[in-house]
């Protein structure tokens, strides 16, 4: 029996599935089984990989969505540990070896995750959690009136906004990290469920959990076609202490190798963006009892999420849903922006017209900010030049 069961759901990923499987085969830790659940593909995905590796278990089912496919794979898993990979993503070679070294060193822990890189093709790439804790979540916390992400006194490490402790990688993993392109990493630990109110802190791709954790948390919620990993990871964090390695363990690709955008059916962007954001809102409401919470912070974060859902609906030209969610959002701290968008949708002759107006207003806003930054910069340059000129003239008069 293999030590690690790797779960890979797939649907019409003929262009990426081989690269995903190859990234598992390149792991420096060899004791794994790979369970690929074909969720009713029609493009020959299953035929392409059948029989390609004796450690590969290929399962078939009628299309039930990614969460149904993950659940089938988890129920089939035989390993002591369960790891996840999407069929359009890849693991870095050290992922399983470093994860297993961690669990040997800390046998009482039940789940581990790491940083993952989002590759946006021509737009570049980002390290998700680092970007979230430096650029995205702190402004959101400020708007919600939350102090939960404040750094401890004298600390500048953004990961400490969430994790209570940090330590260097010990003897258990130092040599493994030294063989990676990154050369150094730290281990962060703590109870972080309450911090999940701001959004994802982890991704499934670099996450490994024990069978004990799987049995405690259960399966993925099939009510949500996209994004159920948010509530699953939050439940893990509510039940267990979180462990996080601050070095990339996996890469999430939004583009195929030929530069074309991947099929959007399983992504949180493009045509499925509204569904993704709506489902995240509903999961947030369930996890934090937002509909009846007396907590002002939870209420404010709920309004922020409603605004995001309303914008996503507007981008897709869905007038009814845009009015619904923007109408709910305009009751909170997001009110000025939500109210303006709500009135825009109300007065526009059609959803398409509202979408065009919204898109143009967004472009104008971005352009205005760029112009303002440029004007501010030139004003600073002019003030500096004027100060130097005045100083020079004063010195000349003195002589």
Describe the residue ranges of each PLM region.
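A conserved hydrophobic helix/loop-capping motif in glycosyltransferases and polysaccharide synthases
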Residues: 4-16, 20, 27, 37
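Acidic helix N-cap motif at the loop->helix transition within catalytic regions
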Residues: 15-18, 43-51, 90, 94
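A conserved acidic beta->alpha catalytic loop
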Residues: 23, 30, 38-47, 86
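Acidic donor-binding/catalytic loop of UDP-sugar-dependent glycosyltransferases
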Residues: 44, 89-102, 120-121
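Glycine-rich, basic loop-to-helix element that forms the pyrophosphate-binding segment
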Residues: 61-77, 98
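Short aromatic/hydrophobic "clamp" motif used to bind/position activated sugar donors
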Residues: 82
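Conserved nucleotide-sugar donor-binding catalytic segment
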Residues: 114, 140-273
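Catalytic core of nucleotide-sugar-dependent glycosyltransferases
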Residues: 135-144, 248-256, 261-293, 314-332
């Amino acid at each position: 029996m293999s030590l690690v069961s790797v779960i890979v759901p797939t649907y019409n990923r003929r262009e990426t599935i081989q690269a995903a499987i190859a990234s598992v085969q390149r792991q420096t830790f060899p004791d794994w089984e790979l369970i690929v659940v074909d969720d009713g593909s029609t493009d020959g995905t299953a035929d392409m990989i059948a029989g390609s590796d004796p450690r590969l278990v290929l399962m078939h089912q009628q299309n039930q969505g990614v969460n149904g496919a993950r659940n089938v794979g988890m129920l089939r898993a035989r390993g002591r540990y369960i790891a996840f990979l999407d069929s359009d993503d890849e693991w870095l070679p050290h992922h399983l070896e470093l994860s297993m070294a961690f669990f040997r060193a800390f046998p009482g822990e039940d789940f581990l995750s790491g940083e993952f890189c989002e590759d946006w093709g021509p737009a570049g790439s980002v390290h998700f959690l680092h970007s979230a804790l430096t650029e995205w979540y702190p402004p959101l916390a400020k708007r919600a009136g939350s102090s939960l992400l404040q750094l401890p006194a004298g600390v500048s490490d953004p990961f400490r906004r969430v994790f209570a402790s940090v330590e260097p990688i010990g003897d258990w993993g130092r040599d493994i990290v030294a063989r990676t392109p990154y050369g150094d990493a730290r281990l962060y630990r703590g109870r972080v469920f309450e911090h999940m109110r701001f959004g994802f802190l982890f991704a499934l791709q670099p996450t490994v959990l024990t069978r004990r954790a799987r049995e405690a948390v259960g399966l993925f919620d099939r009510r949500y076609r996209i994004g159920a990993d948010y509530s699953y990871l939050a439940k893990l964090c509510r039940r267990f202490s979180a462990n996080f390695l601050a070095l990339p363990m996996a890469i999430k690709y939004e583009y195929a190798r030929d530069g074309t955008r991947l099929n959007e059916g399983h992504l949180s962007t493009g045509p499925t963006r509204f569904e993704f954001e709506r489902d995240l809102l509903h999961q947030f409401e369930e996890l934090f009892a937002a509909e009846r919470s007396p907590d002002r912070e939870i209420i404010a974060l709920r309004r922020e999420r409603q605004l995001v859902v309303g914008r996503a609906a507007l981008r897709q030209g869905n007038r009814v849903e845009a009015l619904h969610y923007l109408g709910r959002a305009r009751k909170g701290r997001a009110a000025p922006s939500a109210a303006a968008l709500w009135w825009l949708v109300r007065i526009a002759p059609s959803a398409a017209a509202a979408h065009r107006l919204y898109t143009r207003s967004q472009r104008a806003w971005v352009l205005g900010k760029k112009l303002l930054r440029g004007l501010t910069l030139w004003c600073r340059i002019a003030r500096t030049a004027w100060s130097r000129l005045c100083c020079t003239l004063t010195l000349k008069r003195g002589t």
